[in-house]
Amino acid sequence: MIISTTSQLEGRPIAEYLGVVSSESVQGINFVRDFFTRFRDFFGGRSQTLESALREAREQATEELKARARQLQADAVVGVDFEISMPSVQGGMVVVFATGTAVRLK
């Protein structure tokens, strides 16, 4: 399954647009680690905890996007966009939304 942020795939013409597919992934951030994240952010360092949670959420959202595209018998998802939300800094949560267009290739 090809996942692309572009609307076209070089050398792979699109035969049919099958519709919009979307997914989301919510990752909790360990409350104790979150304290250290805020401490590190205050001093300008990188937060491994937050980066790890974001990476895992993005990977899960991508896998779910692929699964939904497969249900439509798609070969690829184009125009993929990821949005990241942290609905509650106090709650220690990160949400990744992924959307794209499922397509069948020639």
Swiss-Prot record:
SUPFAM superfamilies noted in UniProt: YbjQ-like
Superkingdom of the source species: Bacteria
Listed Gene3D superfamilies: Hypothetical protein apc22750. Chain B (3.30.110.70)
Matches recorded under InterPro entries: UPF0145_dom_sf, UPF0145_YbjQ-like
Name of one Pfam family that matches: YbjQ_1
Family as reported in the entry's similarity comment: Belongs to the UPF0145 family.
Annotated protein name in UniProt: UPF0145 protein Pput_2816
